[in-house]
């Protein structure tokens, strides 16, 4: 998957570069080069992304077929209804969670749009910058998902607990360090994306604020990954539904529409969502109800 994603992103960048902009002359090392471009604008971006996704799909299918452990070659095409029902039972809550979070993000951005151009620009850039700093947590989430599923299959309760505990602690430590960088150098980070001083100032303010939630987000990703690896996907959905809409969107709406507050207040609502989700998932883990999956 890492290699496929790398190729997909490279294809995406190349085709976006060629399809969005018109033909132009580029100066490099004192020489002029004519670079072809389709000049399609937004449509070019869509085509470039679509081509990249198709390339990624083909490469992933090829990789799956080459892997003797998961290759479908040689197996009958008749669907197994029992397996399909089990897959659907695990998948549906995860789909609903993604939908809840996606709609929540759209609603959250819509609220910020009403604050004006500068707050919206600061929000968009700060979100992009923050994503780069919590990226290590995604790796720990993938590890927790894979290893938890293996431990569950082996019926090893002690190993399962150790995997979750170890991955959770490392993720919290790493994201505490990245959060520390966000807190110390928010203006430097914002200046990488924009030269506008007002946007930098507003974005730096919220980046420093959100830095306190990074360790909690690291724990959230590991616990969600572990629960997903065990097939226990419903709790993550219910918790995300509650925290996103009751602790982020509703309070943010009240802050903006009722009290006329700005970007910082809205981001406090986001921080409350992240921390609360982490604590609720941790509470479920400590209660041990997920151990029923081993029985």
Could you say what each language-model-derived stretch is?
Residues 15-24, 31-40, 99-132, 150, ...:
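Helix-terminus/linker motif at the lipid-water interface of multi-pass membrane proteins
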Residues 1-9, 45-60, 138-141, 210-229, ...:
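Short runs within selected transmembrane alpha-helices of multi-pass transporters and secretion channels
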Residues 1, 109, 122-186, 217-240:
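Small-residue-rich hydrophobic transmembrane alpha-helices
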Residues 10-18, 61, 106-110, 132, ...:
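Alpha-helical transmembrane segments of multipass membrane proteins
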Residues 3, 7, 93-101, 129, ...:
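Hydrophobic alpha-helical transmembrane segments of multipass membrane transporters and ion channels
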Residues 8, 52-56, 60, 64, ...:
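Transmembrane helical elements of multi-pass membrane transporters/channels
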Residues 17, 49, 62, 94, ...:
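Transmembrane alpha-helix boundary and packing residues in multipass membrane permease domains
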Residues 27-92, 148-213, 255-295:
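Short alpha-helical transmembrane segments in multi-pass integral membrane proteins
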């Amino acid at each position: 998957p890492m290699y496929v994603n790398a190729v997909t992103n490279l294809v995406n960048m190349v085709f976006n570069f060629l399809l969005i902009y018109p033909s132009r002359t580029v100066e490099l090392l004192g020489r002029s080069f004519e670079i072809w471009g389709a000049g399609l604008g937004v449509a070019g971006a869509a085509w470039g992304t679509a081509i990249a996704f198709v390339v990624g799909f083909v490469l992933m299918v090829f990789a799956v077929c080459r892997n003797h452990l998961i290759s479908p070659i040689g197996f009958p095409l008749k669907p197994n209804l029992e397996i399909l029902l089990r897959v659907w039972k695990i998948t549906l809550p995860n789909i609903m969670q993604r939908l809840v979070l996606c709609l929540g993000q759209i609603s959250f951005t819509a609220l910020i749009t009403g604050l004006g151009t500068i707050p919206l620009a600061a929000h968009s850039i700060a979100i992009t910058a923050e994503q780069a700093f919590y990226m290590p947590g995604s790796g720990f989430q993938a590890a927790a998902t894979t290893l938890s599923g293996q431990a569950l299959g082996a019926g090893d309760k002690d190993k399962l607990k150790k995997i979750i505990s170890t991955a959770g602690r490392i993720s919290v430590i790493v994201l505490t360090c990245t959060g520390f960088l966000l807190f110390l150098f928010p203006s430097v980070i914002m200046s990488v994306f924009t030269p506008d001083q007002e946007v930098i100032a507003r974005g730096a303010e919220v980046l420093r604020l959100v830095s306190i939630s990074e360790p909690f987000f690291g724990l959230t990703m590991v616990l969600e990954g572990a629960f997903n690896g065990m097939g226990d996907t419903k709790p993550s959905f219910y918790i995300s539904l509650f925290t996103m809409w009751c602790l982020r969107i509703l309070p943010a709406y009240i802050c903006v529409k009722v009290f006329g507050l700005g970007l910082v207040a809205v981001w406090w609502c986001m921080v409350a969502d992240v921390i609360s989700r982490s604590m609720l998932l941790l509470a479920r883990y400590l209660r041990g109800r997920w151990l029923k999956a081993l029985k």
